[in-house]
Amino acid sequence: KASAMDFDDLLINTYHLLNNFPEAILKYQNKFQYILIDEYQDTNHVQYLIIKKLAALNENICVVGDDAQSIYSFRGAKIENILNFKNDYPDYKSYKLEQNYRSTSTIVETANSLIGFNENQIQKTVWTENEVGEKIIICKCGSDSDEGRLVANTIFEIKLREQVFPKDFAVLYRTNAQSRSIEEALRKQNIPYKIYGGLSFYQRKEIKDVLAYCRLTINPNDEEALKRIINYPGRGIGNTTIQKLIVISNTSNISLWELINNLDKYDHKINKGTCSKIEEFTTLIKSFISQKENQDAYFLAEHIAKSSGLFNDLYNDKSPEGVSRFENIQELLNGLKDFCENNEENLLANYMRDVALLTNQDNEKKEDFNKVTLMTVHAAKGLEFPYVFVVGLEQNLFPSLLASDSQENLEEERRLFY
């Protein structure tokens, strides 16, 4: 419709062109007589088919890659492309580059030991001439909160003892949702941090949406919260209607909440169907307000997330991004549960006061340079730090629950940890 193509379209249409038009494939086979491909383990199926077409005439093809670093199957990468190269080109020559120049021998030997459990791989033995280095330390924690505190306290101690900087530390986790407990612990120690390639926990859209419902429950006159969620999840109250309501509330010198509870008193020119939707929304929020003094923060927030439709809206999105957003909501509720278990004053209003302090820190503009780096293991590929923590190494977290259904997926989790 837009006369445009995304990256996948470009690949698929290139393949169709080469497959269906003999003059096109002949032209490009003669044009590209030598083909070199880097990071071959990350290629997907259609890229593989394009490569096969282009290389078929001359078979002058050189691929570079490491099957043990194939960690992007969720993007369509096929480890079989590199594993089966020898079958596609029987006259191939293989050169193994096994010396590691970056890591200590302790890390190299541990990684070799780990990846050795994978059956589906090209056999190799990585080695290094580097020093032995420090031992890898394994810590057991009772909960994610304990783990966050342990990481923050250890960073604080090493910083003082070794006279190093926050930028020398990285904390890696399997999913973005795991950052919450780490972020909260670092903030309590006043240790600056940044989320690499993403937003801090309380800046993520789905978290802001749930908290906006909570803010409106505590204070119905919070107009920013009301405007954010009056039509989310979608309930048929469009932007035009919202703008009309804002104008009326401003000219009548009343709050938006007061207006939408007394619409029949004002000349609004909003159709009956939309008025009915607005009434349903106010009834929903009033039901939350009625519980704010007699239910704890966890119970009420979970009820809000489910009754508002927000929980279902995210649950039904099965894309990788949707799954990540749903995990973030679950992690927010875990945080609320921790709050209720550790505080006698555990009403939603008390929790929101604590969260306000955390989100205010997010809004402070600070330099990104000298901060602890928090990121997923996927995002860490290719980076290095003097001190690294890997958190959440437990069944169904890392390795992921999604990996438990097949040997292939479990081996990818092992490659990811490698």
Q: What would you call each of these model-derived segments?
A:
Residues 1-84, 99-103, 304:
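Conserved helicase NTPase motor core
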Residues 68-75, 102-103, 196-218, 230:
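Short alpha-helix plus adjacent loop in nuclease-associated cores
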Residues 30, 49, 109, 113, ...:
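Generic recognition of well-ordered alpha-helical segments
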Residues 57-60, 66-68, 89-94, 132-136, ...:
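Short glycine-/polar-rich loops that comprise or flank the Walker A/P-loop
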Residues 70-73, 103-109, 116-117, 123-124, ...:
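Switch/connector loops and helix/strand junctions flanking conserved nucleotide-binding motifs
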Residues 90-93, 98-192, 215-219, 251, ...:
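Helicase P-loop NTPase motor core
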Residues 179-191, 204, 211-418:
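Conserved helicase C-terminal RecA-like lobe
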Residues 65-68, 75-79, 99-101, 111-112, ...:
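A short beta-strand-to-loop transition that corresponds to the Sensor-1 phosphate-sensing loop
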